[in-house]
Amino acid sequence: MTLSAQKISKKIVCCCDTIALKEITVSSVIPLNNKQVENFYKTNYFSTIDNLTAHLEGISLIKRGSYAMEPQMNGFSGGQLNITISGMKMFGACTDKMDPVTSYIEPSNLKSITLEHGTNSGFYGNNIGGSIDMALQEPNNNSKHSFYSALSVGTESVSNSKNILLSTGYTKNKWEWGLNGVYRKSEPYKDGSGKTIPFSQFEKYNIHSVVRYLPDSTSALKGDVLYDMATNVGYPALPMDVSNARASIFALEYQRNQRNYTVKAKVYYNSVYHVMDDSHRDSLFFVHNKTTGKTDSVIMRMDMPGRCNTFGSFVVASFRLNDKNRLTMKADNYINGSLAEMTMHMHFVGKPLESPMYLQTWPDNVRNVTGLFIQNTTAFSDRLFMTLNGRVDYCLDHLQSDVANREFSVFNYNLPRKFDKLTKSVNLSFQYFISQPFLFTFEPGYSERIPTITEKFGYYLYNAYDGYDYIGNPYLKTEKSFMGRVGMMYSNQRFKLNLSQSCNFLTDYIMGINNSVIPPMNFYTNGLRVFQNVPGAKLLSTDLQSTYSPMDGLYFFNLTKFTWGRLDSDEPLPLIPPLKNLISVSYEKRQWTFRIDNESALRQNRINLQYGETISPSYSIFNFKSSYHFMFSDSMLDVSTGITNLFNVAYYEHLDWGRIYRPGRSIDIFFKYTY
């Protein structure tokens, strides 16, 4: 039996997760397709992006404060992941990773989140750990009225937070427009022991507008504008806070869908500005004076702004070659300019002021990356499918000044103005329907990644987790991964299950290595480390998702995730979370909804002491939520109440820097009016 290429796209189960937040569908890996799944990911109307991603398969969060947590996927983080917004490349402007790309997005302006694991993420660029693509919300063309709007307000007692959400839109003829905005303000929260955690406050604004024009039934032209600004953001686990972090995104997209082919083209620009600030911290240090043998009192403050601008474009085309094959091609390019500065003001008490010391912690650099991605999907039968894809990226780094050369000359580096690297990837995916409810998948793959700007050109970057200064290495090799991933899926009307396991063998693994020759800069460091390629490492991960509905209105949802990592030196990989389990039980009856959640994690005793890790204890917390829907002729009012951390447990997770307790019991109240 032959299967057309059009049917391929409907029948085949891609090796990625797509969680659609508005359309209420979860793709491929586990096609749950019901509202309870959306409710599992979005625990309330004002769920932050951190709260949402923490509920995704394989995702953990590195926490430095109560805002802007850094996502980790199956043990991979930072430059090992592709994190994009509607396919657009974007990068944080903070050398301390205080502004991951996810921090500039709100769930209210998201349409869906797509996950791809391991090396099979070449559609978004060569990488080894996977990809997270956050698709921006589109105008609501399913509304019964040409004009629609919604207003939500809410508060959380643990941090006295204030949340306001507004969304509106208008459709007429061939034009569609949507607008949504969020305001959040949170005071320092209290942990489970009743202690207020200083420097855990934040305030932010986010607004997104989209316009779409439909010239005919097969074409669409869309424009997006997004602006996000956060102020007074505290980071209790770090020696500095953030006075201002803002981002702007502009995009123009054209899409055409025909029976035998589809084409999408996009051009975009985004800009990020980030300012670290220690003006509210205790900046008095006591330093031993080797000359006098006495202890000097030193007041030190630092100004640390960072800038990151990205211009990019891509074209994607998908063609039906014949009844069994569909070909997808993508050509893309982005140009990223980055610069991070530090001005250090030092004052030895009782002595004249010293002149400020200036350096560039990221030199003024422009990175230009051009890539080509090709993929073919073949249907051998209505039960067996194979996808083969490959990608090549060419990266050119161009230093814009001699500052980096002067700084690195101290370490006997003579830097050229230009560096180039070529990376490649190739991946296979086999999908076999053993029977109608059973699906088996197998994915072998290989990929490489280019070193990040921090790993390549970082200059005296202090890491508060292990207490070391870090310096980049301009001559790092590309990091490489050989991956194997298997999955088993089962689905019927009442019960659905997805089990996946992956194994990654890494070579030329990049990490900071102690260097006793180069002195550290900061008074309070344990020493200095230089980024180097180490021979190798291994990462194993297992994820289990299931949902069960024994009767109408009653739903059980479970997510279990586990990661194991080890260096070739037989030491544990640092920052690997222990086994974690999430369970949700919900019940719906007419306008009422009730839900109780449990989040538990085991003790993590596989730690790397050299990198500042300590054993983290196990924990288990419960959350409760209820809501009632008031229905009117043309509108609806939702009233939602909940208690998070029901038993006021004092706990922290293994990836939480500084072992600072998370929020204690909180009573939450939310109202949402939709017209």
Report residues per predicted region:
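Short acidic/polar hinge/loop motifs at secondary-structure boundaries
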Residues: 89-118
